[in-house]
Regions:
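A conserved hydrophobic helix/loop-capping motif in glycosyltransferases and polysaccharide synthases
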Residues: 11-13
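Short, contiguous alpha-helical
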Residues: 119-126
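Conserved active-site tyrosine of GNAT-family acetyltransferases
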Residues: 20-25, 93, 121
Length: 134
């Protein structure tokens, strides 16, 4: 591939499109950058900032679940979103209908991470980078 990957899109089929759109756009603050419709449906593209693809083995996934939640809960895909204030973002997400799996918890890698079950069946980690230990 001469130019490499230029953009990553995580494409999610949401049975309740309106609720999922409102949650990710209005509650988590993802900016709408495109919207399209067909005779049978709709799609909206939201800007989630810089995207990375994190690939881990089952042992690492189990370790992260243990640190963030205390037990194995994630499926094959988990979406991690960096936010400026993990506690406030978690509260807003829960108020908007996300299920809290674990409250914001400081991790060994110096981030404050919460775990939620969000709309459209996406398990979410909301994380805030804390910076170096003082």
């Amino acid at each position: 591939m001469p130019n490499g990957v230029l953009e990553m899109r995580l494409v999610v089929t949401a049975p309740d499109y309106g609720a999922a759109l409102a949650f990710y756009r209005d509650v988590l603050g993802m900016r709408e950058i495109g919207a399209f419709s067909s005779p049978g449906g709709h799609v909206t593209i939201l800007d989630a900032g810089r995207a990375t693809l994190e690939i881990g083995d089952p042992g690492q996934a189990a370790y992260i679940d243990e640190v963030e939640v205390g037990r194995r809960v994630a499926g094959h895909v988990r979406v991690a979103l960096q936010v400026g204030d993990a506690a406030a973002a978690t509260d807003a997400a829960v108020a908007a209908g996300a299920e809290l799996l674990a409250p914001p918890t400081e991790t060994p890698w110096r981030s404050l991470n919460s775990r939620l079950e969000g709309p459209a069946g996406l398990q979410l980690t909301l994380f805030e980078e804390l910076g170096p230990a003082s």
